[in-house]
Amino acid sequence: MKKNAVHFGAGNIGRGFIGKLLADADIAVTFADVNEPLVDQLSHQQEYKVKVVGSECKMETVSHVTAVNSASEALIERIIKTDLVTTAVGPTVLDIIAKTIAKGLSARFAAGNTQPLNIIACENMVRGTTHLKQQVYQFLTTEEQQQADALVGFVDSAVDRIVPPLQAANDDPLEVTVESFSEWIVDEQQFKGEIPQIEGMEKTDNLMAFVERKLFTLNTGHCVTAYLGCLKGHRTIREAIEDPCIHAQVKQAMQESGEVLIRRYGFDRALHSAYIEKILSRFANPYLVDEVDRVGRQPLRKLSANDRLIKPLLGTIEYGLPNGMLLKGIAAALKYRNSSDPQAVELQQSIEKEGVRSTLARYTGLAAESVEAQQIEALYQQMD
């Protein structure tokens, strides 16, 4: 019997990454999205193309998929019967879909479905599914919460695949381009019932090590590349990382954050060094056109205490490790200007009004009088 999955978010990551892995594992996927034209087209065509780009390009077709509107009763009907729910909607939208998931669970319990259900949020956030669970439970009665405790697994995951926006020249709106590299790691301790066998979904009992490995390496390296690239006038991540000066600085920033991971989780230094090299080569992928503005956007979120710049910095402080290039990356983030990004505008207004160190204290939690804030301010002032 074919398994079913409901996947929230029919955007590039939904189609190009999670939806594709599910469909490749012979699971019937229903995408749920608010974008009506996209939903109509997916439910009409029931397939789409994915261009997978690594050392070469190959085109693959994902089939046996359909789509429903996130606000529809049809979605609730699907949740009543489904075996798996996944999301790729972005951290802010997670809170919005929680109510819909709760409604689906209520209907599922009312219909007497006692089969276990697993829910996996595939978002760029630490323990995103645990956060989603807290939001969902706000809309369930005490009795429903008890049923959910028994029957519903909220499974945290770490995901990694670069999926840039499609080039506008393409006339197929469903086609998506993804890199050949992908990593989807799930916390095997949180499943209810049997764990689905999905090629490309790895299980671990130490998820936090992998969440931080990705955050401190891929995400840290990506945004440092973007912010240093912006300062030198590069347009894309590839252009920036092929600048030898930026390449060396990004590599050093990832090595600094890597020392925190090695200390904290006991990662093997040689293997971690190879992981860093792999990421540098991914940034230079000639088939991925990823603009520095896309990777640099929402700087306030990226400068928050639990995110890709400050969290590794705090680790270097905790263990007394060198952090000069992480500090430089943070200074470059403070220089990020983009008039169409409200967070970038707010950041620049704050620096203008309150100065660098007060801005750091407000958005990152670093004390304004700390050595690190003073070093960041000095680096900021040296930048053009």
UniProtKB/Swiss-Prot annotation:
Family: Belongs to the mannitol dehydrogenase family.
GO molecular function: mannitol-1-phosphate 5-dehydrogenase activity
Protein's name in the database: Mannitol-1-phosphate 5-dehydrogenase
One matching Pfam family: Mannitol_dh_C
EC class: oxidoreductase
A GO CC term assigned to this protein in UniProt: cytosol
EC number: 1.1.1.17
Species, as recorded: Vibrio cholerae serotype O1 (strain ATCC 39315 / El Tor Inaba N16961)
Catalyzed reactions: D-mannitol 1-phosphate + NAD(+) = beta-D-fructose 6-phosphate + NADH + H(+)
UniProt cross-references to Gene3D superfamilies, sorted A to Z: N-(1-d-carboxylethyl)-l-norvaline Dehydrogenase, domain 2, NAD(P)-binding Rossmann-like Domain
Gene Ontology BP terms: mannitol catabolic process
Binding, NAD(+): 5-16
InterPro entries: 6-PGluconate_DH-like_C_sf (IPR008927), 6PGD_dom2 (IPR013328), Mannitol_1_phos_5_DH (IPR023028), Mannitol_DH (IPR000669), Mannitol_DH_C (IPR013118), Mannitol_DH_CS (IPR023027), Mannitol_DH_N (IPR013131), NAD(P)-bd_dom_sf (IPR036291)
PROSITE patterns on file: MANNITOL_DHGENASE
Record's keyword annotation contains Isomerase: no
Keywords: NAD, Oxidoreductase
Gene: mtlD
Superkingdom of origin organism: Bacteria
